[in-house]
A protein has these predicted regions:
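N-terminal helix-loop segment corresponding to the beta1-alpha1 unit
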Residues: 1-179, 183-189, 301, 338, ...
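Terminal low-complexity tails and localization/encapsulation signals of metabolic enzymes
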Residues: 1-11, 223, 239-240, 321-384
Length: 384
């Protein structure tokens, strides 16, 4: 940022891999924290090997690990244990997403660490939480999407589908990040550290609350409707001449405006099939046919222009490449360069925008790039 970031001077030790924990700690790094990432000796974070699409590097790793220092370490060895002890003695935050039971076997459980380091904040990220029948079960994003019910409400009537991004991991990473910030704020008041856990199932479960409420209290399962909204109509893609336009409504006022100003079908406002949103959802197929009949004479650009003039929300379906060239991002100067071992890459600024301050887009580290420097700093008497 312009000057020191809000977390400048904070030391985070991260024994992490994959997505959830690295997403949390990368956001801490964006705020100025010093993040020391411990990677497995000889292999590193296995996310380094997911693909080679970004100048020979994995897209997930480049996204999630900028601004960190990479230390290659065998944490099971005597030296590895000594290094971890030295790091944690000075750390403010310890984040780990090891396999179930691994932290305890390594002597890195939260209870033991807090007994030795009273101001340390310990964050443990897991698939299903520290107890219960699923505690020891391995968890990956798609599998947690299944267990949380997300696939049951996503896709077409015939085929359930996963979300196109690692939504369970991302959810857990966000809650781990905010959990760390909350614990830091609490430490300012109490002078003591604390520990907390975040599970992928709990994180995604929070996001699945509306479908749960709809199902359990409404007595019916949400429909899988592809790109359409399951409980609001009209809301989704509609075919125009030469392409689709996505339209979204939220209330009866907007419905009346759509009928009058966009469709030129004010008679639909009083049509008993479409009087309320539940009515429109019930008769969605009929309504879709009516809307698309009107839009068939207009190009997508003409439809969007008419929707904009009427104040009705709309969107065009974009690919990732088209998103990267989005005119709104360009107009707001949202792109920066981040260094990687393979060369500079474009990266989006973090979503939180503070006037006069800009997040530091730190470099993505090579495996073990900072090992010797960190060991010399934290174990100055060590002999190689």
């Amino acid at each position: 940022m312009s000057g020191a970031g809000p977390l400048d001077g904070l030391l985070v030790v991260a024994l992490e891999q994959a997505v959830a924990a690295p997403f949390a700690t990368r956001q801490l790094a964006d705020l100025g924290a010093r993040v020391i990432k411990i990677e497995r000796a000889g292999a590193g974070d296995f996310a380094r090997g997911y693909d080679t699409s970004v100048l020979g590097q994995a897209s997930y790793f480049v996204w999630l690990n900028r601004g960190k220092e990479s230390v290659e370490l065998d944490v099971k060895s005597d030296e590895g244990r000594a290094v971890m002890a030295a790091l944690l003695a000075r750390a403010d935050v310890f984040v780990q997403n090891l396999a179930p039971g691994a932290a305890e076997r390594l002597g890195l459980d939260a209870a033991g660490l807090l007994a030795r380091h009273r101001r340390l904040i310990c964050c443990s990220v897991s698939g299903y939480g520290p107890d219960g029948p699923y505690a020891a079960k391995k968890a990956y994003d798609l599998l947690v999407q299944c267990e949380a019910g997300l696939l049951s409400v996503t896709g077409t009537p015939d085929v359930p589908c996963k979300a196109g991004i690692s939504v369970a991991d991302i959810a857990a990473g966000m809650y781990a990040y905010t959990g760390v910030l909350t614990a830091l704020y609490e430490r300012e008041r109490t002078g003591r550290g604390s520990s907390f856990t975040v599970s992928l199932l709990d994180a995604l479960g929070e996001w699945m609350t509306q479908p749960y409420l709809y199902t359990v209290y409404g007595g019916r399962e949400p429909r899988r409707t592809g790109a359409r909204h399951a409980s609001i109509s009209p809301y989704g893609p509609y075919q125009a001449r030469g392409g689709e336009v996505f339209i979204g409504l939220q209330n009866e006022r907007e419905w009346a405006v759509l009928c009058d100003k966009v469709l030129a079908r004010s008679d639909l406002i009083t049509d008993e099939r479409f009087t309320t949103n539940p009515d429109r959802v019930k008769h969605d197929d009929e309504l879709t046919a009516i809307i698309e009949d009107v839009l068939a004479s207009m190009t997508p650009d003409e439809v969007v222009a008419r929707l904009d003039a009427a104040g009705i929300a709309s969107a065009r379906l974009r690919t990732p490449a088209e998103f990267a060239a989005h005119p709104q991002l360009a107009a707001r100067d949202r792109w920066r360069e981040a260094d990687t071992p393979g060369g500079p890459v474009r990266a989006l600024l973090p979503p939180v925008t503070v006037p006069g301050r800009e997040a530091t887009m730190g470099a993505v580290p090579a495996l073990g790039q900072h090992t010797e420097a960190v060991l010399a700093e934290f174990l100055p008497g060590r002999t190689a």
